[in-house]
């Protein structure tokens, strides 16, 4: 058959759309979606035919031109375009707060509250008892004050946003004093100095990368009176223009650590210095640990204890050790939080009803530390004991062997980690199932698992594929095993 004959054999779009399968599909997905898919399939066939050489045209599969064949291809095309880019995966890496996998899984009550709140209208900015307009800032502020001991609180969309609005409200046009050892990059090339520049505040670095004393902060303080006599050409070899000091700031080293010959000013020392000079103290905590977890090897500062040192403002993430949704949470003295709520950035950085729904349900768990430990997945994973993990590893190994008799499983000891820019030096002793799938290499097996209906994201160490059970929920064991079929 010649190329022109093949082109004449292309079916008409309307004829293909009359196929019963596409009529039903159009009712579900819409006429436009299905018509566009048919048009795309026919256009592809036309292009394929035009690319043929005359002498090879007779080799073209004419069955592809049938209406039912085009309809089938259109169905595949619609299904492919309907596939979501954001979907569930199983975390078998042993990294609890895996940034690439969405950080903290939500607790069941948070999930239910999001579903309930998002199904219809909500009390986002309406005071139901009083029958008048309300403020979203009030939704979780009382709960945060109760849990942290703060005078007031507000929520923005992430901790970088919290840093931005805190510095803009408290430090614009003034200097913020920070230790050189705490000028962190928080991920994605976003750095504290860059955020400070955007806020309009001026960075004053003190100390060195490994040692910063409280006297370094005090020596850097610039008052209005001092500015009157300040001459950058005489006082500073760099001839740097100076501004009045607006605040002292401490940034928790949550995604790295400095060991060896080190020294840093404590929150207590900074709070005392701030009171002495009438300067507020800001603590960018980052990780959001609400309760003491030292019993489980996590010796990180917690929020209530940090605020109790006398600092003025504290900010942290919602989706790290707090175990909630992505959010930037700011707690502290009422005068500073009130200024942030009125700041123009507050509207640009505000969060939606689903974030508040998840956050409120998560925070409620912290009214009883035992309940938080039981119900919040992040805390539960951190606190999992070795006996529980060993037993889960044995069940997973048995399930994988049952799914595929060619797979060789071995239970091995591993070191899990917190991840997500939290507690970088902490290693949690755990267990994993080391898997050898027939003659496949670890890399090939890892790719196979990623192609499963629910992709399994595993860990490779020393050319061994490891399924770390700390981050695999009990109800996910069957799905992991099915990925080996």
Regions found by a protein language model. Give the residues of each.
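Glycine-rich phosphate-binding segment of PLP-dependent enzymes
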Residues: 43, 92-93, 103-129
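Flexible, glycine/charged-enriched surface loops at secondary-structure junctions
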Residues: 28, 53-60, 85-88, 230-235, ...
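Short Gly/Ser/Thr- and Asp/Glu-enriched loop/turn motifs at secondary-structure junctions
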Residues: 10-11, 90-94, 322-325, 428, ...
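Long amphipathic N-terminal alpha/beta scaffold segment
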Residues: 56-106, 112-113
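Structural motif of enzymes handling amino- and sulfur-group chemistry
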Residues: 335, 343-344, 351-402, 412-415, ...
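Conserved PLP-enzyme active-site core in the AAT-like
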Residues: 83, 131-366, 401, 483
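Conserved C-terminal alpha-helix-loop-beta "cap" of PLP-dependent enzymes
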Residues: 386, 390-473
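Long amphipathic alpha-helical segments
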Residues: 1-78
């Amino acid at each position: 058959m010649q190329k022109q004959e093949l082109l004449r054999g292309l079916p008409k779009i309307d004829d293909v759309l009359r196929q019963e399968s596409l009529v039903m599909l159009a009712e579900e997905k819409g006429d436009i979606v299905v018509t566009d898919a048919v048009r795309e399939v026919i256009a592809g066939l036309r292009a394929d035919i035009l690319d043929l050489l005359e002498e090879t045209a007779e080799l073209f599969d004419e069955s592809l031109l049938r209406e039912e064949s085009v309809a089938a291809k259109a169905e595949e095309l619609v299904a492919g375009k309907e596939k979501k880019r954001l979907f569930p995966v199983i975390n078998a890496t042993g990294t609890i707060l895996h940034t690439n996998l969405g950080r903290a899984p939500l607790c069941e009550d948070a999930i239910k509250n999001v579903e309930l709140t998002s199904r219809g209208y909500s009390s986002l900015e309406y005071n139901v008892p009083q029958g008048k307009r309300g403020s979203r800032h009030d939704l979780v502020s009382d709960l945060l004050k109760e849990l942290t001991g703060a005078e007031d609180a507000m929520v923005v969309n992430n901790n970088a946003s919290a840093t931005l609005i805190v510095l803009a409200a408290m430090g614009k046009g003034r200097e913020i004093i920070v230790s050189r050892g705490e000028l962190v990059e928080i991920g994605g090339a976003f750095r504290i100095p860059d955020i400070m520049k955007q806020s309009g505040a001026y960075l004053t670095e003190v100390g060195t990368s490994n040692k910063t004393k409280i006297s370094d902060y005090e020596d850097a303080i610039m008052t209005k009176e001092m500015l009157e006599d300040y001459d950058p050409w005489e006082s500073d070899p760099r001839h740097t223009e100076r501004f009045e000091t607006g605040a002292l700031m401490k940034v928790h080293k949550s995604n790295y650590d400095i060991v060896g010959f080190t020294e840093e000013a404590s929150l207590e020392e900074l709070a005392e210095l701030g009171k002495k000079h009438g300067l507020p103290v800001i603590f960018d905590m980052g990780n959001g640990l609400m309760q003491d977890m030292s019993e489980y090897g996590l010796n990180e500062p917690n929020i209530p204890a940090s605020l109790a040192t006398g600092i003025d403002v504290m900010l942290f993430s919602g989706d790290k050790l707090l175990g909630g949704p992505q959010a930037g949470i700011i707690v502290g003295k009422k005068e500073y939080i009130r200024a942030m709520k009125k700041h123009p950035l507050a509207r640009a950085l505000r969060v939606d009803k689903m974030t508040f729904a998840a956050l409120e349900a998560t925070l409620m768990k912290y009214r009883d530390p035992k309940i938080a430990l039981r119900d919040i997945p992040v805390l539960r994973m951190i606190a999992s004991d070795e006996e529980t993990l060993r037993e889960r590893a044995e069940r997973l190994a048995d399930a994988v062997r049952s799914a595929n008799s060619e797979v060789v499983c071995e239970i091995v000891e591993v070191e899990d980690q917190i991840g997500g820019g939290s507690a970088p030096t902490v290693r949690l002793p755990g267990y994993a199932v080391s898997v050898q799938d027939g003659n496949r290499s670890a890399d090939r097996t890892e790719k196979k698992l990623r192609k499963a209906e629910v992709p399994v994201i595993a860990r490779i160490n020393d050319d061994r594929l490891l399924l770390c059970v700390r981050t695999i929920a009990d109800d996910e064991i069957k799905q992991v095993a099915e990925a080996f079929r």
